[in-house]
Amino acid sequence: MGTCLKGNMSVLSLVLFLLSVQQFWAQEDPLLPFSEHLDLEHNVQLKWGFDKIQGTILFQLSVNTSGWISFGLSPNGGMTGADIVIGGVDNKGTYFTDRHALGNSMPVVDQKQNYKLLSLSESDGKTVMKFQRSIESCDENDLPVTILPMKLIYAYGETDDISYHKAQRGTKEVNLLKYMPRASLSNATYFDITMENFMLPANQTYYHCKTARAPTFDSKQHIYRIEPVITNYDLVHHLLLYRCPPTVTEPLELECYTKTERCMETIAVWGVGGGDFEFPEVAGLPIGGNVGDFFYRLEVHYNNVNKTAGRVDSSGLRFYYTSKLRQHDAGILMTGLAVIPSYAIPPKAKSFLTYGMCDTTYIPKVLETANDLQVFSVMMHTHLAGRKVRVGHFREGKQIDLLAVDENYNFEFQQVTNLGKTKTVKLGDKLLVECTYNTENRNTLTQGGLSTSDEMCLAFLFYYPAMNLSGCESLPHFSSLVSEMGAGDTGTWLYMMNTMAWNDSSINEYQQTLKKINQTVIVVNSFNKASITNGTIPDLKVSPPEPCVRACATKNLAFMSLFLCLAGMWAS
C-alpha cells in the first residue's frame, strides 16, 4: 500500500481505485481452513481463519443445540477474566453480545462491542454462529489473540433462556494463529490400553499401574492420534503410558512405585481437562515390526477426594494407528525437576520459584546414537500450588528462546500445548523448566511427591526423531543445600525447615539458595542407564509482554500512506 502509483490516472480511475481499496480492507475471509471439536462428544465444533494483513480473525461456532451458545478466550480455562460472546436464535430473531466474566456468574455485557456478528442460523437442532474480531485488542475487557496457544471455552443451553450451563461446558487449548492441521485417514483402526474394572481403595491419592503387552504387528505401524478413555472424570487426574525394556516379559498389576519401576520411557500422557492429541503429519509413535513387541505400563493417578471405596474404573488410552508411515518416529522426553520428597516448598509463599534443568550435552553418554530434538509440542505439569510454568531454551550459555510458556497455569485444565512450529533443540543445549507456586493458604511444607497435595515441576517434550530416552532432569544437590543452610545433617535440616518462621524474607532467601547451589543433572535412557553430573541454574528472562496495537491503527496508517502518495503524484 505504500508504493506510489505510476503514470497518469484519471479522477474516475482514482475513485474506483479507492473504492477497491476500501472493499479490500472490509472484505470478509470466506475460508475457514482450521477446525477443532472442542468437546469429546463432537457436539461443539469451532472453525476459524485469519488475515494478518487486515488484523482480523474469523470464527464459526457450530453446536448441536436449539438454545443459546457461547464461546470465549480464557486466561486459565475458567470463567474469571474470560472474553466471551453469547448468541442464539429465539422467536424474536437473532441475538448476539460481546461480554466478559468476573467470576462463575452471568458474564457482563461489554460497553464496547468488539465482536462483529456475520451470520447466525438455527436448523435441525444445530445453531451456527459466524463472527469476526480484531486479532489484537486494547479493550481491557477483551483478550488479544496471541501466537501462543490459548485456552478456548464454550458453553451452551437447551433453550434460549441464558442460564448456568451445568455440565454443558468445557475448555480446550488451541494455537489459533499457529495451528498444525490434523491428518484425515479413512478406515481408522485403533487399540485400547485401559484398566479393566479396577476397584478403587478409599485412598485420596492412589496410583495404579498395569503392565501389559500391546497388540502385535508384522510390520511397523505409526500411532498418529491418542484419545483418553475415561470412565470416571471426577476420579482420574492423569494417565501415563511407559514403554518397558525387553527385560520385562510378564504382565503385572499393582499399586505404582511399590517396587522398582523398570518401565520409564514415556510414550503417552494425558492430564485432567485435556482432550485427544494428534501428531503432526511428519511424525508418529512407532509400534510393531522392527520396533519390537514391547510390554507397556499404564499409570493412572486417581484423586479420590471423598475417599470412597469400591468404585470401579476402566480408564486408559486409545491409540489410532496406520500402516502409512510418516517421515519420522516421534518420542516423548520428561524434563524438569526430579520428583523427590526432600525438595520442599515453604508455606505462606505468594510466589515461589523452582527449577529443573535438562542438559542435552549428556544425552550421548547414555545413547550410542543421539540426535538433535525437533520439538513440536509440550505438556507442562504441576499440582495444586502451581500458577505458572515456563520452559527456557539456552545455547552456548545464552537464552535463545522460551520453548513453552503458561502464565496462567490451571491444575484442572492440563493439555498438550501445540507449539505451532517445530523448534530445534541441539545436542549441547540446556532446557530450564521454571515453575511458580502459591502456598499462601498452606501452613506446612509442601514436598515433592506423587500426591495431589505434593508438588511436581515437569515438562513433557514431544519431539522427533525418537531416541531411546526416558528422562532429562535435575535436583538441587542435597548435601550442598544442607551445608548452605548451616544444618549438620538431614534430620537437623528437616527440623529447621519445619520450625522456621516463614516470611517474605526467609522465603526469598531459601529460594535463592536452592537456585545458586550445585544441581545434580540426571539423564536416563529407556534401559535405565543413567548419566549423573553437576550443573548450575541459568537466569531466565522475563516473558516479553504482548504489544497492544489496534488493527484499525494499521488500517488507518495504510490509508494515510496511500493518500500522501496520491497527493504527491498530483502535485508533481
Swiss-Prot record:
GO molecular function: copper ion binding; dopamine beta-monooxygenase activity
Record topology, Cytoplasmic segments: 572
Membrane-crossing residue ranges in chain numbering: 553-571
Active site: 207, 381
Signal peptide boundaries: 1-26
Topology, Extracellular side: 27-552
Record-annotated disulphide pairs: 209-256, 244-263, 358-472, 435-457
SMART domains: DoH
Membrane topology: Single-pass type I membrane protein
Subcellular location: Membrane
Ligand binding (Cu cation B): 381, 383, 456
Cofactor: binding comment: Binds 2 copper ions per subunit.
Enzyme Commission code(s) on record: 1.14.17.-
Pfam families referenced in this protein's UniProt entry, alphabetically: Cu2_monoox_C, Cu2_monooxygen, DOMON
Listed cofactors: Cu(2+)
Single GO cellular component term: extracellular space
CDD domains from the UniProt entry: DOMON_DOH
Annotated family: Belongs to the copper type II ascorbate-dependent monooxygenase family.
Protein's name according to its UniProt entry: DBH-like monooxygenase protein 2 homolog
Natural source organism: Danio rerio (Zebrafish)
